[in-house]
Design a protein with these regions (language model features):
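A solvent-exposed, acidic/Ser-Thr-rich amphipathic alpha-helical stretch
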Residues: 23-97, 172-219
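A generic structural micro-feature
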Residues: 81-82, 95-97, 113-116, 210-212, ...
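Hydrophobic/aromatic beta-strand elements that line small-molecule binding cavities or substrate pockets
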Residues: 86-92, 104-107, 119-125, 216-221, ...
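Short beta-strand segments that buttress and anchor functional surface loops
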Residues: 102-109, 204, 229-237
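Short beta-strand edge/turn micro-motifs at domain boundaries
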Residues: 114-148, 240-263
Length: 263
């Protein structure tokens, strides 16, 4: 789909159609294939990938709308939910056909009290039809006002380790910097899920094995109990580009779970 005039129009359409309980309209806010990656690993419900699976890819709008119809809104309504309010998004990185937006939402009851709040990194891409959300990197453990300095430091440390293994071309140790399955979001329409380290080696081992000087700047975007989103501007050799990461703590280890790059 991805038929919106601007990235922010697609972002707001996401919430408007969710609140209307319009499965087709909600699916129309996305670009495809679409992926939702969560820092939290919930139990699988047995009905295929859902918005909160660790890494669920939806090939088409029909696939996403079918998931939404199947899952329904009853589970939200049972908590007292009547609407979800998106926060004003902030542009993190942008090119002519891809944008990283720092956004999020709060679910409200009828009396306007808050049920839960989240922070999400939205990856928007411009397809032939227009803009849509290609990927969502969810913190899924966000608490307003909580001190997350330790989580931010751990996530930045995980990124630093990634860089210190990449610079000398140390592929074996570089491969250990990721949680698998690893989600990669490239050019518009390019979403891949790498199942394990050997698949990552086959796909990117030659690229990572080239020793090149690296300089970069990185900042945290949002942090939760077990997940942090980061932004990075990097120069590697002659190439300069921007990246956003979802870094997650799983089994006590902070590693990269998802990456989106903008050249």
């Amino acid at each position: 789909m991805g038929s919106h005039a601007t990235p922010t129009a697609a972002y707001w359409s996401f919430f408007e159609n969710f609140n209307r309980k319009d499965a087709d309209g909600w699916a129309g806010a996305m670009s495809y294939p679409h992926v939702r990656v969560s820092a939290v690993q919930p139990p699988r419900r047995g009905d295929g990938p859902g918005p909160r699976t660790a890494s669920g890819v939806y090939p088409t709008a029909s696939d996403y709308a079918a998931m939404a119809e199947r899952a329904g809104w009853e589970r939200f309504e049972l908590t007292g939910w009547v609407r979800t309010q998106g926060i004003t998004p902030r542009v993190v990185h942008a090119s002519s056909d891809k944008v990283h937006l720092a956004g999020g939402w709060t679910r409200h009851r009828a009396d306007d009290s808050e049920i839960v709040t989240n922070r999400v990194l939205y990856v928007l891409s411009r397809m032939e039809e227009g803009w849509g959300i290609q990927a969502r990197f969810g913190i899924d453990g966000y608490n307003k006002g909580a001190d997350r300095s330790a989580q931010k430091a751990a996530a930045l440390g995980a990124l630093e380790r990634l860089m210190t293994t990449l610079e000398p071309g140390d592929v074996d140790n570089w491969l250990t910097c990721f949680h698998y399955p690893l989600t990669l979001v490239g050019a518009p329409g390019e979403v891949s899920v790498i199942d394990d380290a050997e698949a990552m080696r086959a796909a990117y081992g030659d690229w990572a094995g080239e020793a090149l000087p690296i300089s970069y700047r990185a900042n945290d975007i949002a942090a939760g109990e077990n997940g942090v989103t980061l932004s990075q501007s990097i120069t590697r050799g002659e190439d300069t580009f921007h990246q956003s990461f979802l870094v997650a703590q799983q089994e006590g280890e902070w590693k990269i779970l998802a990456v989106s790059a903008i050249a």
